[in-house]
Amino acid sequence: SGDGIDSTSQNFAKALMRSGLDIFTHRHYPSRIRGGHTYVEIRAAGHEVQSRGDGYNFLLALGDSFARNPKEEAVYGDEEIKPLSENLDELREGGVIVYDSGLLEDDDVAELNLEERAEENDWHVFPIDLRGMAKEHGREVMRNTAGVGVTAALLEMDLEHIEDLMTDAMSGDVLEANLSILRDAYEMAQEEYEFEHEVRAPTGEHDEEQVLVSGSNA
């Protein structure tokens, strides 16, 4: 919580919508004001989507899920692993997992029996140091943007709509830094990994203009 998950997921959902897809999102909130495991589900299809659906095909584990008070330098509960551990059960056979190896210790990942479960379910796992990439570009919070770049590459999406949304929301050095890490992460994934998974972004086309709104605003 507090790591930009909401804005990152909303922009990714809008990019899918602008590419011609129908979108349905669901936001899970932790039961406390600051900190705790939070996640967003995005369902996208080339036909009308009216519900969340069951399970998902792609898991991007971001953030550290800490409950913390920076002023007191206090941390309430070590929950780094939750973005990965608490969402595995709903990942479908043949699904894709991207997690930030720069945030998670090998021992924590090993306790999940991820390797064995991946083999049993034909999951395709990509441990990528998103945190390290973000630090190289000057701001650790941009690991989310790096994650989006990797995700877009693995789904064989074009970056055009994502870049347009960033340009609408940012400016100056912040925009340039985010565009840079987005493109670098995208190209890194294309160059360094073999795409043996079958999960790809669907294709679609809208007959009329679309808008993405929350249930409250609707």
Model regions: which residues?
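Active-site cofactor/cluster-binding pocket
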Residues: 2-218
